[in-house]
Amino acid sequence: MSSPAEYYKSLPPISKAYGTLCFFTTVLVRLHILNPLFLYLYYPRVFKKFEVWRIFTSFFFLGPFSINFGIRLLMIARYGVMLEKGAFDKRTADFLWMMIFGAISLLVLSVIPQLNTYVLGLPMVSMLVYVWSRENPNAQINIYGILQLKAFYLPWVMLLLDVIFGSPLMPGLLGIMVGHLYYYFAVLHPLATGKNYLKTPKWVHKIVARFRIGMQANAPVRAPANGNAGTGAFRGRSYRLNQ
């Protein structure tokens, strides 16, 4: 059995970075180094007080230490990691672009009063779970050892459990909406029409190549000398649509 350090080292880069930032954000809140009120997305303060950091920090706060926090962190460690290692294997730039698209979509939807939510880390996790469930619809999932179901239904079951345990409905619902928006334009629409409107931009490929983050076998730009390059088998329907 691998040690915790070896397990952490084996995690794919984007999921590892996102989960780590979420964990340490909550640690800093717990130590009273960060005030959670300064992390929330609150547009009046963003535009009137120029507190632009809220646009970013709201994605890395999953709430205080609690069972719900632990569950969401485990979702990143499980479903985010499986998605990045599975359908997005050797496609780091594409995975990063999915996260960026999700973040932008959540920021836009949060402008609508009826959809407004102050902590965007929660819908971001729901988005990852939704996309994974669409890429692996027939995988068997065991919920708390008492319920077994196909992965396709996982986001909706988790949404129901959130409501049962007293969490707000909107964050999870927003994540499902944005996840479906991504999956429709990145997978379903290209399959139907042959046109992919969500092809990963070159500037995202350049970021991955410049900082040598993970691997991108179908990259339109070259990594720096000594950078990792590779080819191999790809899993998941999304890959074939991003070439």
Curated annotation (Swiss-Prot):
Keyword Transport annotated: no
Tissue-level expression: Expressed in roots and endosperm.
Chief site of localization: endoplasmic reticulum
Transmembrane segments: 21-41, 55-75, 95-115, 156-176
Superkingdom of this protein's organism: Eukaryota
Membrane association type: Multi-pass membrane protein
BP term (GO), one: endoplasmic reticulum unfolded protein response
Name of the featured protein: Derlin-1.2
Gene name of the encoded protein: DER1.2
